[in-house]
């Protein structure tokens, strides 16, 4: 019964994939999925299958679990890869959210174009997800919960056990004498999902035995409504989207349509969707702001900013205004906070900077406050703030643009200009930025 359900889901949803990647935690659900896929691959040798175990390091048993997953995958003739991730405890992002984000990031390293990621969520997980969305006051997108099949970057993500109950999976594991790991954190009812699992859903099942199917139908209907809305607004979003992925404010239309377009736009990025209150704040404080204002709304380590009548999604970076790094000729200088590297390279001709003299130390900094500069070919000096405006550098990037100094004199602003006193043909300045 369980195998038949999995096989039908695989063949119905992924007709063009020939490689599967199992997210293998080692718990009951993924352990059963591994066993089922072992049989599927044996009966269908035209398909390939790997497994990935993500080692979070949160439990003293984590190393043991990883070894067990390797052994179980070996028994099924499936190659298993171990991915180690590090979580930051005590920050604003919950351990649950961090673990989920890091887990999918680790899994993505093993899923290539056209592959299919398999995860073992089941009908009881769907019920919990729906209840958590209700608790948050989610709209149709959140209440749609987990789709059986969706995209995963340039590949696919399938949950082939989503219509199966937890009890059916347990019965299968026992019947086939499978072993699995028991994560002690699953008993910790400080986590919302565990509280629901142990305290709430048993009562719901007792009162309404058909609640899993009812919730599954409601989630599917919400998903259909959200998909329909996105389809109807797709051409509107395309018109509002700038080539740099910013959003043109003038194309947003009414508040009702505009806020939905902002949600669709944000779905293009790897950010947590803002709450209704945050979305309202984005509309009131950023979209409707005066043209000369510099508004921002922060959430989930990101910001919504406005510049030149367009909206931007900007990551919240640490302050690097005090950063100062000495640079050597022809050696890459590492920059902080995802800004990549900067290298001053000697060339025979057609460079942009003169060579530093013997007594001149080359350094890179980021604090533009109070600095004046005269770009090569310009008349008169101007404050860097004014020059950044002329060069149309958004305000949030002005303290993230490398300033190259010879001793304590500004020689160049990476990517923009060289100052008059330091112009020459001896060196090139290359900024390879990651962000």
Swiss-Prot record:
Record bears the keyword Zinc: no
Q: Name one Pfam family in it.
A: ATP_bind_3
Where does this one sit in the cell? Cytoplasm
The organism's place on the tree of life at top rank: Bacteria
What functional role does this protein have?
Answer: Ligates lysine onto the cytidine present at position 34 of the AUA codon-specific tRNA(Ile) that contains the anticodon CAU, in an ATP-dependent manner. Cytidine is converted to lysidine, thus changing the amino acid specificity of the tRNA from methionine to isoleucine.
Q: Which PANTHER family match?
A: TRNA(ILE)-LYSIDINE SYNTHASE-RELATED (PTHR43033:SF1)
What is the protein named? tRNA(Ile)-lysidine synthase
